[in-house]
Swiss-Prot record:
Locations listed in the record: Cytoplasm
Protein name according to UniProt: Transaldolase
Gene from which the chain derives: tal
EC number: 2.2.1.2
CDD domains, sorted: Transaldolase_TalAB
Catalysed reaction, written as an equation: D-sedoheptulose 7-phosphate + D-glyceraldehyde 3-phosphate = D-erythrose 4-phosphate + beta-D-fructose 6-phosphate
Phylogenetic placement of the source organism: Bacteria, Pseudomonadati, Pseudomonadota, Betaproteobacteria, Burkholderiales
Organism: Cupriavidus pinatubonensis (strain JMP 134 / LMG 1197) (Cupriavidus necator (strain JMP 134))
Residue numbers annotated as active site: 126
Length: 318
């Protein structure tokens, strides 16, 4: 049995792509998108028609902003025709520090999905794990709008999300590894930071164990992988969202995949609670240079790709 099929025995496998044609062969349960993945997809000839249709359908309703939302919904609906579960659709990263605007955008996206006949239970609204984003999620969850908290790099972000009642978090693995490699430079020891010792893997394991120890219902979905080794090291996580390239590698690789994370192991661990009110959140995040820098960088990158997509829409709209 290949590694992908073995992984599915322990973990819900999610496709991390906007390229819905590509995901079919891996039969994922759910799918995740973000501005960068949508931008990448719409530049392919086979998806140009979706973009042009969104311009025709939405431009007269509210210009470029309306078309941007329409593109997200169009991709989401196509994806939901393939996966049996949920799709994650991301709120504009430029709203990451505005609770009210994030809530309004999320409500609007859900309305658009419901107009297309998609039940809100099949949609996760992706929101950056800033303090303001977490407060937005708290409001939305009470309204039955389920949230996927993204750009999450630290335990305090994860705890704040769980205490807010978020449906799901997406702790990043690869971007954490990237930061530590860059900091170490020529002194980086790849062997010492592989497998279970990978700093990104350690971060997700710490979050998973904390959640299971203290009985939080928020789902843990590891994200942002650089290798199949990172994925295999997190077998047993509630979900893992994986790019098509790495899904392909897992599907082609024979070899044993063992459960690495489990509720029993987590509950047996000696784990202390940490505070995650606003002062504690801001202080602990500030003290974590990696999390602070990667959160800020991630917001900038997603915002930049949203702007590129807007320009593409404006060109088509004429």
């Amino acid at each position: 049995m290949n590694q992908l099929e073995q992984l599915k025995q322990f973990t819900t496998v999610v496709a991390d792509t906007g390229d819905f044609q590509l995901m079919k062969q891996y039969t994922p349960q759910d799918a995740t998108t973000n501005p960068s993945l949508i931008l990448k997809a719409v530049q392919k000839p086979e998806y140009r028609g979706l973009l042009e249709q969104a311009v025709r359908d939405y431009h007269n309703e509210g210009g470029v902003d309306a078309v941007m939302d329409g593109v997200l919904i169009a991709f989401g609906c196509e994806i939901l025709a393939i996966v049996p579960g949920r799709v994650s659709t991301e709120v504009d990263a430029r709203l990451s520090f505005d609770t009210e605007a994030t809530v309004e955008k999320a409500r609007h996206l859900i309305r658009l999905y419901e107009q297309r006949g998609v039940a809100r239970e099949r949609v996760l609204i992706k929101i950056a794990s800033t303090w303001e984003g977490i407060r937005a999620a708290e409001i939305l969850q009470r309204e039955g709008i389920r949230c996927n908290m993204t750009l999450l790099f630290s335990l305090v972000q994860a705890v704040a999300c769980a205490e807010a009642g978020a449906q799901l978090i997406s702790p990043f693995v690869g971007r954490i590894l990237d930061w530590y490699k860059k900091q170490a430079g020529d002194q980086w020891d790849a062997a010492a930071n592989a497998g279970d010792n990978d700093p990104g893997v350690r971060s997700v394991r710490q979050i998973y164990d904390y959640y299971k120890k203290f009985g939080y219902n928020t789902e843990v979905m590891g994200a942002s992988f650089r290798s199949t080794a990172q994925i295999v090291a997190l077998a047993g996580s509630d979900l893992l969202t994986i790019s098509p390239d790495l899904l392909e590698q897992l599907a082609r690789t024979e070899g044993t995949v063992e459960r690495k994370l489990s509720v029993d192991l987590a509950q047996a661990g000696n784990i202390a609670r940490i505070p995650a009110d606003e002062p504690a959140f801001r202080w602990q995040l500030n003290e974590d240079a990696m999390a602070t820098e990667k959160l800020a960088e991630g917001i900038r990158l997603f915002a930049a790709d949203a702007i590129k997509l807007e320009k593409l829409v404006a060109e088509i709209a004429g």
